[in-house]
């Protein structure tokens, strides 16, 4: 029988493996956003790009996340009932069905871009709105490629191959970087939209051979009567909303920001990118690893083991996001300045983005926890509850936006997301307890208290950055200054992270001790080899 410690150890070990690939992808993402800010800044064109992306990316995200999420339980049923060959049949059939749906959406998007633009840019001035309409038409093919990526992600995650799905940000960001470095001055903002489409295609090209290595074989299948595909589509409908609440909140916020003058939508875009970078590195890894495990345990009725996996997952999320929130609040200004303030991105833009990032960072914990909770619901075949919680989240966010937008600008919009998502987490926990019984709430409270204590110590360490920053700025200038600040910031963050982990270890956190045990084991296993060599 697998105990809670081994469940936590397995999750921790797998998370470490996939996090490395995600981290590399996000490093490329950091350079991509820095280049974007340098070339386009917070201009009218960048406002239009962020608004168009909010619309097309939301549609694409609906398709990708819903398919990747519903693929696993449906594929599990198909494989259990008929064997591995049925899984291939199901995968190819789902690719065909989603491709047809995507083609319809693309045609509608190209024919009716004005209506889609209303989703994200109804408050924009006529000139910006016209650019948004054009960019939506150019960007709509992303929906098709996103559907392919969603299916391949689901296939690989179900097969336990997380490294490839963790690395897909690399081809996406490389596509952007090549465009920004070589072609941006010639093709402009339309080219950036084309790069965003080609980046998703590059992800599919990257995933396909990895899927084929573990048994996937492409075939032309069009069976609209297949019960497993029908089940996946039925499951996907409510999942569309629940897994994309953050995207929906983003599109609502940018819509309101489009009426706040030039640069407001761009400020939200850049701030949200920095905030979601944490989610993209760590939380994506956890949910990708945990979901197949939850599907097999909770889906088969093993509630005891499923709850242990859930407990380890939620606590791991807390151990990552609480210190990340503290760090972002303290270091928001240097992070924004180092990442963006150069070229077309002004110091004034940096000040606005700093305060907005701090408000966005308050949502890190709640967005991450709700992602895990949603996967638990899906694992027990419940897609309706996350749907209702997601709708509630959006309604609260919209209501708060309308109350605070005029008074607090982009800060108010970002804070509204944080408040709405936090309320949604509490609602989701309460409903989940009613559905599956005791959740081990005491262990979560203990974990939260310990991580807050350790995070406060870590936060005190990060304050050491600022006096040295003044010295660096006094002695250097230009690119040398930026590089020096970046290196020292990374050093301070690294030291603070070590102090944080040490504090958790001393506080007796089991998950941290599991990770330390894994590291020690690897070091000890390598010692004999070193001696022999």
Predicted regions located by residue number:
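Membrane-embedded alpha-helical bundles of multi-pass transporters/translocases
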Residues: 1-533
